[in-house]
């Protein structure tokens, strides 16, 4: 499970610039104006072999209360602090230690978490001397950086990695419970769905503390089958408490998805698939999880004999990047069709972990090629020598070919469709990789690997030539 690192501080100290520098991106809007970053942004980065999720937050203004935008942003940042494993506290050397800095430092000190003070805009010796003033915050270590110019960011990431806790999640045990995450935007009925599942089954073994801080995992049994509903803390609460948790729960959703085998993506039948639904579904897709789109509040829809088919078409169109996902219609309020969810979850989990023997796989490939030979490209034709399945969860297949550049996306889709038609892969993504073996100099076997991604994009990895053994 990837650790979460929150970048926090008062407004206009360079948090978003630092976020962009550390993630080598332009995710955050950067303007010289306090309060520009109102919503938390997320991006993964890797340093010294560790992958971590960086969170960019809006400026903390503890003197703001009520329903103002500033108060909303501060509450958001405070939630990020509570959920983070390590905190980067950004201050501005040109302003010196301010009263708001001291207030934020006091807030962070109470969290009892690793805090790294990033003294920003330190670009010369004079400012290095001025940065010493920030020892008054009572937090360490202090790292001098210039987010704009990239100075000191390597030292900052070194300090972050050194402070990271071990969040390794044990692999699901064979015969153990299926891990299920329930995600979706606010007010689509996630909490009602969880309660409906629990009420339907009526057999709750226990509330199991999860690895995520303050998370509650609920173990549900149905006959011999076990399901672990991940991180239901806050999801089952009511009224104002539920509203607050729902509104600021994206970080929890990210972690729940990482821990899950199957993800339930809950959407509101009245709204259809929104852009926010697409983004949330993308979290599960990018993590290679088995997915079920749960269309909730179906009882509120006026229906005819085509209503469900039309909604299914809309879901398929709006979530075209995950056309493998199962779709299920429910009413959490009336519990209609909720009883069918656990069997679907069990099926999706089994498909996600499905392995095909090398012999069966190559028989299928030979039949597929005989039925529909690869097209030629400028007189050259793709040849598939053999295939193997190196991993599951999600299933991944490697095809050894004469030249991976000859693999057209349409033929990759054809092979994927043949796999899906022959074997049960409903609900799970499958990855196809194409590996080239080229003619090489004596004693070498260079290998070029090309992965065909959704949408026809390709990613090529050139591996160093491997020496043949001469002994």
Curated annotation (Swiss-Prot):
It holds the Pfam family MMR_HSR1. The keyword GTP-binding applies. GO terms for biological process: ribosome biogenesis. GO terms for molecular function: ATP hydrolysis activity; GTP binding; ribosome binding. Residues 354-438 form the KH-like domain. It comes from the Bacteria. The keyword Repeat applies. GTP 2 binds at residues 184-191, 231-235, 296-299. Residues 3-168, 178-353 form the EngA-type G domain. SMART domains: AAA. Associates with the 50S ribosomal subunit. HAMAP family: GTPase_Der. This is GTPase Der.
